[in-house]
């Protein structure tokens, strides 16, 4: 109809013509696309290419919008009549330029304003979104001399509209470019006419086809600069796109989320969502990603696939781990199927830093568990590194944690490309660490609006205001609350600004005296919707002030309910600005500012709702800025109204009207005998209302705002540090029980140096003369030379060992190896002397002496020389030669083993007389200058070693920190102990104390005395032919073992005192030790379970959120090696026992260091007064956050009431017993001292401690095991849980073997106050009977607190979420739906059925704005 001259505008014509025109365009595009696909399938030669000639001539593009006023219908077409499918018409004079297929460049033609034959459309700047020219550009090099003209029209003028869209076939070799011509000199368009149905119809004339590009260039062809500029049209800013003919008027950017129409297909402009059109935002056609065949998975390039290993047990276990995990798995395989979950977890981790490590490092080379490492090995060996793999070079992913890119391409999720690009940045070596961090931050900023489209405006605002902050932080800390989708957002920043400005205005009015004006009315910054009539003038001013006080308290209570804790809330409330602090106004001045109090009351009410709403269902650390601003508002208002309430909130608390009514509402009226409960309730409420009405009429006080539960909790919350109560301490210490049999304890930590070897490979024959002192390893060594007696003949002839026997001590699997010592042992050479005299054999442990120096010494020194002794090795005793045929080994010390074997100590430990100090000869270079055995422990403790000049600076003596002492003060007698610096150095070297902890022992002279006592443990002088007895050997072995055990805490916990943040003091049971298993003081019958005194086992059980039973892994009697507490060590926790060497000086030294750093040391003291040492450490308030609690086995209900099976997994806890409450207080202290931004800790979770015990799988196993480790030993056993740990096949397959159950904690008001289960709430008893919590190494403890008098319905609502966490079994798992738990193998198992009713939403979690009250 347009060709025949009919007008191309108007509602009637457009309504009939436009659908036909669109159908014609769609049909032509479909035919062209099908023809090109068929051409690609039927071409014989791969180099054969299309000539690029379109199948149809271009259609005229009518202007459906408002045309120009001087438009006239074009006359009928004249000239030669051409066939519809014939050759192309003559060149159009209005076409700006042409596409040259041979060269890929655009031919430019002169612009014209009319084209009567080929362009009957009127002039206008707007283009139609549906009437488009189809231009087919060849994908490869066409014949060189072929040129087609007039195949496309693209405007060159910046003012013209050059919108285009592209579509292509699935094959990458074809391309369809859609473009439309436009006039370059048309007048500016008039605004479009409003239409009634404009909301339902697509918007026209707004440049719908903006930013088109001509598609990718052919292989081997270089695009012109103009073509590249057109291709990048969509990636330019809005102003540049408008300037380049984007079709949208300047100065009017598109609205966010508006749908852009291309070929009548809606494309949402938020790229994070799935795109429903076959075109992307650039106008290009999406790739067709075919699904892999059945039984195969995506692999390699686009369309590639591999065999799926669905039957492999490793894959099955990996799928189970993936389905149960909440975060991204480190190894993802396509058999897991749910790539959307992995992508979302990766994106969330990259934005919110939930991996606690650098995301780039984690993606590139993150640590893998054994199960994940095995899975990755299978994947690499079978597919990625195989020779027959077609996609060995292209795998479709960057790292093992990222799914194949085909899933993102098929789902059209542009956001899922973020992990691929981030992993590519992490993998490259072209950038340093800082440069990679910059690139990663720029990626996060680019993808922030895509990942969080709802917060795009806040994100842009935050990025512009804080350039250095990452988008993820800005998104999570926006100034708008996200309480509920139905509630309006409360702007906390605006509230803070209004309150701050109102306080400034009030201070200014007080300063200039305007408040004294009788006609003054406050006109400062107040709430816009505030009305003073809300509180009429008849109400007293004090009531408004009290209402503000209670409102302040409600905000403080809301802050205390959050994740910050009392100390951080107190730090927030400590905001003080002296510049705005107002003067003190009187009551008359406050009467003129009543509207200010009303405004503040409303602001505080909104703040309370905003703080509670920001928490959501679970309190998190997000919205920290909102809570900080809310705390500042409370601080400002409280300081301002403080003089009005006389700095005392008691007057607000005496308004008990609301409390009286609330207490009546909470009462249970069903148990009354006065008649109908409803009538009785109404009677009491009416009586209370009458009393309140009488008080109001007499200008009494009545309730304005419901106060908190306890008035004394204003500006105070849970978790305050407690001081230890002063009590009498028993003077008698419990003497340790000495063992009569050997224990595999840890010997003294000194390794014997290897003897130097000559080039032949034999050890040097180093001998030592003079008095021999006990070395650290139990062998004898010389310290100072003594003059030889006249007539003492020694042989100078020696026979060296040609084949010395060397042995290596094999560490037992039940013991822990010492990482600081070498594994190989020192050879024990034996020399046979040809002389008849028998001299005792000595082993040289001093510095190595070269053979040349030894020969020179042997030649210059003869046996007859005075003061000189032969350095040649003497022969072994006759008893040695007759008793043993081979030389005995000298074992290396290691944790869990003894230094001296009973069969070797008799002949290996040799000693002599004490050193002669009057020796005139100087010691040789091969001898130690002084031995610590010369120092007496009594002299150290009494201070007899103090020199005439007094105490030295580097000496060891007690130095109490100055401050207020907590608990008992150590006696003054401990201050007399003194150890000189020289003796300190030798004793520390003797005990092999780690260098970072040597400075700590300078504050503990008691430790020096203990080391000197061990050094003097060997017997005294004896003749040369004597061999020390077995009793002396055993005594020395016991002393060295205990010393090694007492110094183990310095080796296997913190590397340096600077890493200590929390100190836990405890008193172990006899036989308990944290690092030496079994301990040196283990009783002959082994450890005995004590249900009255808790030791190390119960302490570690509290930190690992588990039970401690006699047959559980937590009991020290079952340990085969030291428990693994490395997670607690990484958190800065240091366990100190009262039996550890130098624990007094360690506590005092750490306090001094914390005072220097202006921080406080967190101390958790679990030592009872009867087991406390009289010379214990001095603890002061100024340097510590001190917490006193005890370890009580009776907290476990199975220990307190052994006959009740309903409470087998229940623990009653309080703040006086080590448990979740005390550990949460420690976490709050930790956050106050370290800071929540630096790190987060979880002191009460199963993953904190791992035990090495004997299981049914192996004699020595580290539990809890991983499910994959147990998968190889499947065995159907019952029950599911034995002694509080997983035992059955299905339980171990799900959580691993010996994974502990999570106990249920019930709060006890006072220690041992619950003497019978009947004292517990019935709902708590039912909960403990019917709920078993599954093992979870990362889960927080579950604490049940049901106040007295709580009705059953409310109590059931409080524990509904706990019931939903009960263990449930799926239908595919073996066994029934019941969970069986057994305390031990001697009693009957208890069966617990899963909950039948689904959990429901608690009314306690509904916010104030979600509740509607109607009359």
UniProtKB/Swiss-Prot annotation:
Comp. bias (Basic residues): 245-255
Coiled-coil blocks: none
GO molecular function annotations of the record: DNA binding
Predominant location: host cell
Biased composition (Low complexity): 125-187, 724-738, 911-933
Region feature (Disordered): 48-272, 454-480, 691-935, 1371-1415
Function: This IE protein is a multifunctional protein capable of migrating to the nucleus, binding to DNA, trans-activating other viral genes, and autoregulating its own synthesis. It is required for the switch from immediate-early to early mode of gene expression.
Listed Polar residues bias regions: 96-105, 263-272, 465-480, 814-837, 895-910
Gene Ontology cellular component list: host cell nucleus
Family: Belongs to the herpesviridae ICP4 family.
Name of the molecule in the record: Major viral transcription factor ICP4 homolog
GO biological process, alphabetically ordered: DNA-templated viral transcription; positive regulation of DNA-templated transcription
Keyword list, A-Z: Activator, DNA-binding, Early protein, Host nucleus, Phosphoprotein, Transcription, Transcription regulation
Post-translational modification note: A long stretch of serine residues may be a major site of phosphorylation.
Location within or outside the cell: Host nucleus
């Amino acid at each position: 109809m347009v060709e025949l001259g009919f007008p191309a505008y108007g509602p009637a014509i457009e309504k009939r013509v436009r659908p036909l025109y669109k159908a014609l365009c769609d049909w032509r595009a479909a035919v062209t696309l099908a023809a090109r696909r068929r051409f690609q399938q039927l071409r014989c030669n791969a180099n054969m290419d299309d000539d690029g000639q379109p199948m149809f001539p271009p259609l005229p593009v009518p202007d459906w919008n408002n045309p120009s006023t001087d438009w006239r219908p074009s006359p009928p077409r004249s000239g030669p009549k051409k066939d519809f499918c014939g050759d192309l018409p003559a060149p159009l004079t209005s076409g700006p330029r042409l596409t040259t297929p041979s060269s890929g460049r655009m031919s430019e033609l002169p612009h014209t304003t009319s084209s009567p034959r080929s362009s009957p459309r009127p002039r206008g700047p707007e283009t139609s979104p549906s009437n488009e020219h189809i231009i087919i550009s060849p994908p490869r090099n066409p014949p060189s001399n072929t040129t087609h003209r007039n195949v496309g029209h693209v405007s060159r003028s910046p003012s013209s509209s050059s919108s285009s869209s592209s579509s292509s076939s699935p094959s990458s070799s074809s391309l369809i470019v859609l473009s439309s011509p436009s006039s370059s000199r048309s007048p500016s368009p008039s605004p479009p006419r409003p239409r009634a149905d404009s909301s339902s119809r697509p918007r026209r004339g707004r440049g719908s086809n903006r930013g088109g590009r001509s598609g990718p260039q052919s292989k081997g062809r270089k695009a012109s600069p103009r073509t590249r500029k057109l291709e990048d049209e969509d990636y330019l800013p809005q102003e540049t796109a408008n300037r380049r003919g984007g079709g949208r008027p300047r100065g009017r950017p598109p609205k966010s989320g508006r749908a852009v129409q291309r070929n009548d297909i809606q494309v949402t402009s938020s790229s994070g969502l799935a795109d429903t059109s076959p075109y992307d935002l650039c106008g290009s056609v999406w790739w067709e990603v075919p699904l892999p065949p059945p039984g195969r998975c995506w692999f390699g390039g686009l369309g590639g696939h591999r065999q799926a290993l669905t039957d492999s047990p490793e894959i099955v276990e990996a799928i189970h781990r993936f389905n149960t995990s909440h975060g991204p798995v480190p190894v993802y395989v396509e058999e897991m199927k749910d790539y959307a979950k992995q992508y979302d977890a990766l994106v969330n981790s990259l934005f919110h830093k939930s991996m606690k490590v650098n995301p780039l490092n984690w993606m590139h080379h993150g640590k893998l568990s054994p199960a994940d490492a095995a899975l990755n090995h299978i994947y690499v060996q079978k597919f990625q590194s195989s020779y027959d793999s077609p996609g060995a070079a292209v795998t479709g992913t960057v790292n093992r944690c990222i799914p194949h890119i085909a899933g993102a391409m098929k789902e059209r999720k542009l956001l899922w490309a973020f992990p691929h690009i981030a992993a590519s940045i992490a993998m490259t070596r072209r950038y340093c660490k800082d440069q990679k961090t910059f690139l990663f931050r720029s990626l996060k900023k680019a993808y922030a609006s895509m990942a969080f489209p709802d917060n795009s405006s806040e994100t842009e605002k935050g990025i512009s205001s804080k350039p250095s902050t990452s988008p993820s932080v800005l998104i999570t800390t926006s100034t708008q609350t996200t309480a509920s989708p139905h509630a309006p957002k409360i702007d906390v920043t605006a509230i803070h600004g209004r309150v701050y400005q109102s306080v400034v205005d009030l201070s200014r009015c007080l300063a200039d005296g305007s408040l004294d004006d009788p006609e003054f009315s406050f006109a400062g910054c107040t709430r816009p919707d505030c009305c003073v009539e809300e509180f009429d003038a008849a109400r007293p001013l004090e009531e408004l002030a009290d209402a503000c006080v209670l409102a302040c308290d409600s905000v403080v209570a809301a802050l205390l309910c959050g994740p910050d804790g009392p100390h951080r809330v107190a730090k927030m409330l400590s905001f003080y600005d002296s510049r705005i602090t107002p003067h003190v106004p009187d009551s008359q001045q406050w009467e003129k500012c009543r509207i200010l109090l009303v405004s503040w009351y409303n602001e505080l009410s909104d703040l309370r709702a905003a703080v509670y709403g920001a928490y959501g269902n679970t309190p998190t650390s997000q919205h920290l800025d909102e809570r900080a601003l809310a705390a500042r508002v409370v601080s400002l208002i409280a300081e301002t109204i403080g003089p009005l309430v006389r700095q005392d909130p008691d007057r607000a608390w005496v308004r008990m009207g609301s409390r009286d009514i609330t207490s009546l509402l909470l009462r249970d009226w069903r148990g009354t005998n006065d008649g109908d409960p409803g009538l009785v309730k109404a009677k009491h409420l009416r009586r209370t209302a009458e009393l309140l009405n009488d008080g109001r009429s007499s200008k009494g006080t009545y309730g304005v705002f419901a106060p908190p539960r306890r008035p004394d909790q204003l500006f105070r919350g849970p978790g305050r540090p407690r001081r230890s109560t002063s009590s009498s301490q028993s003077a008698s210490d419990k003497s340790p029980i000495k063992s009569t049999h050997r224990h595999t304890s840890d010997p003294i930590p000194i390794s014997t140096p290897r003897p130097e070897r000559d080039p032949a490979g034999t050890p040097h024959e180093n001998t030592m003369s003079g008095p021999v002192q006990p070395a650290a390893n139990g062998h004898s060594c010389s310290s100072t030379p003594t003059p030889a007696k006249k007539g003492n003949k020694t042989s100078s002839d020696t026979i060296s060992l040609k084949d010395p026997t060397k042995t290596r001590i094999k560490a037992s699997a039940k013991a822990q190896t010492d990482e600081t010592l070498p594994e190989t042992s020192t050879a024990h050479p034996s020399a046979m002397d040809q002389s008849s005299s028998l001299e005792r054999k000595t082993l040289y442990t001093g510095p190595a002496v070269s053979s040349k120096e030894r020969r020179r010494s042997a030649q210059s020194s003869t046996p007859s020389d005075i003061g000189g002794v032969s350095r040649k090795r003497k022969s072994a005793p006759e008893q040695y030669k007759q008793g043993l045929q081979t030389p005995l080994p000298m074992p290396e010390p290691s944790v869990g083993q003894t230094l001296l074997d009973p069969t070797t100590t008799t002949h290996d430990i040799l000693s002599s007389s004490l050193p002669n100090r009057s020796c005139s000869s100087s010691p040789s270079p091969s001898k130690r200058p002084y031995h610590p055995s010369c120092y007496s422990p009594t002299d150290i403790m009494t201070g007899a070693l103090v020199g005439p000049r007094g105490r030295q600076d580097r000496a060891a003596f007690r130095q109490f920190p100055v401050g207020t002492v907590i608990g008992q003060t150590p006696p003054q007698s401990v201050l007399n102990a003194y150890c000189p610096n020289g003796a300190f150095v030798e004793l520390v070297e003797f005990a092999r104390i780690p260098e970072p902890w040597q400075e700590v022992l300078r504050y503990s002279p008691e430790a020096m005395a203990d080391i000197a006592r061990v050094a003097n443990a060997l017997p005294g002088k004896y003749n040369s032919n004597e061999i020390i007895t077995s009793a002396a050997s055993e005594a020395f072995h016991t002393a060295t073992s205990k010393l090694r055990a007492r110094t183990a805490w310095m080796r296997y916990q913190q590397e340096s005192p600077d890493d200590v943040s929390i100190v836990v003091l405890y008193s172990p049971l006899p036989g308990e030790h944290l690092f030496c298993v079994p301990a040196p003081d283990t009783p002959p019958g082994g450890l005995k379970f004590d249900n009255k005194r808790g030791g190390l086992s119960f302490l570690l059980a509290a930190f690992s959120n588990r039970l401690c039973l006699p047959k559980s892994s937590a009991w020290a009697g079952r340990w085969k090696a030291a428990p693994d507490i490395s997670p607690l060590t990484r958190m800065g926790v240091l366990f100190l026992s009262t039996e550890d060497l130098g624990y007094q000086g360690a506590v005092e030294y750490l306090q001094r260091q914390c005072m220097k750093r202006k921080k406080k040391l967190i101390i958790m003291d679990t030592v009872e007064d009867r087991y406390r040492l009289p010379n214990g450490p001095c603890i002061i308030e100024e340097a510590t956050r001190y917490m006193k609690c005890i370890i009580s086995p009776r907290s476990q209900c199975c220990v307190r009431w052994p006959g009740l099976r309903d409470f087998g997994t229940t623990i009653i806890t309080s703040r006086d017993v080590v448990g979740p409450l005390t550990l949460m207080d420690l976490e709050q202290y930790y956050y106050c001292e370290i800071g929540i931004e630096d790190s987060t800790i979880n002191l009460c979770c199963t993953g904190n401690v791992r035990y090495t015990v004997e299981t049914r799988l192996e004699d020595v196993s580290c539990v809890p095991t991983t499910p994959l480790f147990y998968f190889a030993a499947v065995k159907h056993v019952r029950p599911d849980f034995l002694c509080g740990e997983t035992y059955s096949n299905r339980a171990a397959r799900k959580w691993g073997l010996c994974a502990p159950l999570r106990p249920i904690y019930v709060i006890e008001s006072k220690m041992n106050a619950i003497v019978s289960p009947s004292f517990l709430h019935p709902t708590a008893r039912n909960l403990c009977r019917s709920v078993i919590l599954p093992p979870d190494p990362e889960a927080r403890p579950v604490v049940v607190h049901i106040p007295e008098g709580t009705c059953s319905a409310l109590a059931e609502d409080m524990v509904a979420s706990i019931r939903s966490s009960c263990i449930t079994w799926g239908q595919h798992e073996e066994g029934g739906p019941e969970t069986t738990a057994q305390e031990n193998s001697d009693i009957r198992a208890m069966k617990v059925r899963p909950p039948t009713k689904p959990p429901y939403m608690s009314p306690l979690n509904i916010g104030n704005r979600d509740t509607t009250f109607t009359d």
